[in-house]
Structures are given as C-alpha cells and as structure tokens.
Amino acid sequence: MAYCSFCNKSHNVGFISTRFAGTDGVSLETAKWADVYDRVGFTSYFFAGELDHPPERSFLVEEAHFQHPDIKDVFRNCFGARIRARFVTRKIHELKRKIKDRLYEFIEKFEIDLIVPENALTIPLNIPLGI
C-alpha cells in the first residue's frame, strides 16, 4: 500500500473517461497524471469503457465507451437534429443512472478519495457519462 508523501496516509485516485487504452491523447496524459499521483503516494484506478490497465486497477463499464451502440444512438439523435425527441431524453437518463450506479461501485470497490474526469465532461461524445 502506498502512502501520501504529504500526510503519510493512503489515498486512492479514480480516473474516469470513455477509454484508457492505446496512444490517444487522453490515455497518454492520464498515464502521466497517474505517474505523478503514484510518485506522491497515491494509488491510481481507472473507470472506462475500454481499458488496457492491469485488471486489479481497472473497472470496465461498456456504456462508458463512446462506441457503445446505445451511446452512438444518443449522439446521432442529439446532433444534427433540430428537436430532441422525448425518447432520447429518457434514454440519456436511463444510461446516466446505469453509469452512475457503476461509478458508485467503482468508488466503493477501490475506496476512491479523489475523482479525476478526463474529457468526460468537456467533449459530448458520451452525454450520459458527462451528466
């Protein structure tokens, strides 16, 4: 178990995004931040729809990925349409609830102290994840 170099207690940081895999910018920048947190005594964990991190530090939620069929359907119905149909709003909230429930599981399983969202709030590829 790692201990924080500032307070000598253990802390867990949870990174959240659609994907932490490969060499895209978000994955590379998150790896840098995880290294910084790890060097000061935090332990890093990852929540996403695609992961290439060790399973003991990963929490896979398929609906978090922007390529998930339901997420792609929401995206298609929100962008390029002048009016959003009510079924789309219902679907967004249904998916949001599912992702939120899994997020609580992630927080509890890894005893997360700090959440770091990576592009989940700024880029609307996965609207339910951003909500």
Would you name each region that the model predicts?
Residues 88-90, 119-122:
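Surface-exposed cleft-lining segments at the edges of enzyme active sites
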Residues 2, 7-10, 36-114:
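A conserved catalytic-core segment of Leloir-type glycosyltransferases
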